[in-house]
Each structure stands twice: as C-alpha cells, then as structure tokens.
Design a protein with these regions (language model features):
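Conserved ABC ATPase "signature" region
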Residues: 104-121, 138, 146
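ABC ATPase nucleotide-binding domains
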Residues: 223-247
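Conserved ABC ATPase signature
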Residues: 125-129, 133
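Conserved structural motif at the start of ABC-family nucleotide-binding domains
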Residues: 3, 18-20
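Catalytic Walker B motif of ABC-type/P-loop ATPase nucleotide-binding domains
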Residues: 150-154
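The feature captures the beta-strand-to-loop junction immediately N-terminal to the Walker
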Residues: 34-36
Length: 247
C-alpha cells in the first residue's frame, strides 16, 4: 500500500528537472521533501498528484494516483473570492457549492477550524484573511476529505513558527488516527527534523539522500546540499536532530 516512484523523470527541453527519482514511501508517516530552490520539489509533488507530465512510474496502493482520491495543496493555491471560510472548507467534501451538506460535515469542518485556532473566522470572506490564515483554511479543506495520501507544497510558508508547529501537531495527529501518508515540501530544516519521520533530499534533480530524519539530516549532508556550515545536536532522549547554523 506504498507510494512507489520508479525512474521518474521530468525534462523541460534539455533541462533535467527530475532525473531518475526512485523511492518507496510507506503510509503512516510524514515525509519531508527538502532541498535548495530549483531542485524539483514542487515538480515532484505535482508529478505525484498527476498534474505534471513525467516519464517513469508512480503508483499509490498498487494503482495510478487519482487526483480525486487524494489531498493536494499546491504552492500559491487559489482562493474563491466570494466564499466564506466555512464554505471554502466544505468544498473539500464537495467540488461545488449548492449541494446538500450534512450537519456532520459542517461540524467536522468547524472542528478543524477550531484546531487551527481560526474557528472565529468561519463566516469571514476569504479575501479578508491574511496569507497565513488562507493557508490554514485551504489545509483544513484538504483534511476534511480525510485523504489517505496528502501532498503539500510549502503549505505553511506564510505562517509564523508557532502556527507552523500547530499545523504539524495537527498533521501528526491526523496520521496517527488515519494511517495516512503526508508528503510535504518544506524549507525549515528544524521543523523537518522535529516533525518529519522520513526525509527525501533533492539536489541537482536527483535524490541526494533518503531515510529517517536522524540519519539524513547530518552536518555533512546539509553542508553539501546548501553550502553552509551547520552544527547538528541531538538532545538526550529526543527523537529528532536539530540543525543550528554555526557562527
């Protein structure tokens, strides 16, 4: 029941955006997709979602990925200007408004908004929200569907650190409850080390490193990826590493 990537390639003319990507991602975890800008993180997520042309094979639960059966939040997701927060979240269950929505779905949507500390905004128009608040609403929309595969491209980039940690706490709880697989492109290595079970590093269109966070987020790997010196510390009894820039 894994997400399997076999020899996945994406080319724009003569430029290799992704070159022979191979990985097997198991459900029941958060996978952090990291790497410098321009290494193909967004392209890989879009390829998995099936909205980007690629060569090779991508399968989920032994079948091609069906966008209608997964959760996909691309970078800079569009919001419907005239909809309220609650209406926007409910679109996660129905593709269009006007359909009869049961009270159970309304209650579930309201509960997710409360989890994200924005329940008080339920009747506010989406265009009156900050960028970070819009991201929270759009993530709530994806979670309402309860997908077994959730693909997130920089889904917390407009949030401050406190709200980012709240989102990851919510994602961890979601994974624990549903056994879903969450794949998220993320730049913050400290957040990746704290909340991601597995790390997939991309560099120069290839998989540079892949494995458990403790094994992959090393001083050598980070220095080779980003060209910066780091110190990696592991607190006694802690599950994850923390990355600190030297200086």
């Amino acid at each position: 029941m894994s997400l399997i990537l076999e020899h996945v390639r994406v080319n724009y003319g003569r430029n290799n955006i992704l070159a022979d990507i191979n990985a097997q991602l198991e459900p029941g975890q958060i996978v952090g997709l990291i790497g410098p800008n321009g290494t193909g993180k967004s392209t890989l997520i879009k390829s998995i979602a099936g909205v980007q042309a690629y060569s090779g094979t991508i399968s989920w639960q032994n079948a091609p990925v069906n966008l209608r059966d997964i959760g996909f939040m691309p970078q800079n997701s569009r919001v419907e200007a005239e909809l309220s927060v609650l209406e926007t979240v409910l679109l996660g269950k129905h593709d269009r408004l006007g359909l009869r929505v049961g009270s159970a779905y309304i209650d579930a949507a309201a509960a997710i908004l409360e989890d994200f500390r924005i329940g008080h905004l339920h009747d506010r128009c989406m265009t009156r929200l900050s960028g970070g608040q819009q991201q929270l609403v759009l993530l709530a929309q994806r979670l309402l569907r309860e997908p077994k595969l959730l693909l997130l491209d920089e889904a917390t980039s407009a949030l401050d650190i406190r709200h980012q940690m709240q989102v990851f706490d919510r994602l961890n709880a979601y994974v624990a409850r549903t056994g879903a697989l969450v794949v998220i492109a993320i730049h913050d290595l400290n957040l990746a080390s704290l909340f991601c079970d597995t790390i997939l590093m991309l560099k120069d269109a290839h998989v540079f490193a892949y494995g458990r966070a403790q094994e992959v987020l090393t001083e050598g790997n980070v220095a080779a990826m980003y060209g910066v010196a780091t110190r990696v510390t592991v607190e006694e009894g802690a599950k994850h590493v923390r990355l600190l820039k030297e200086g």
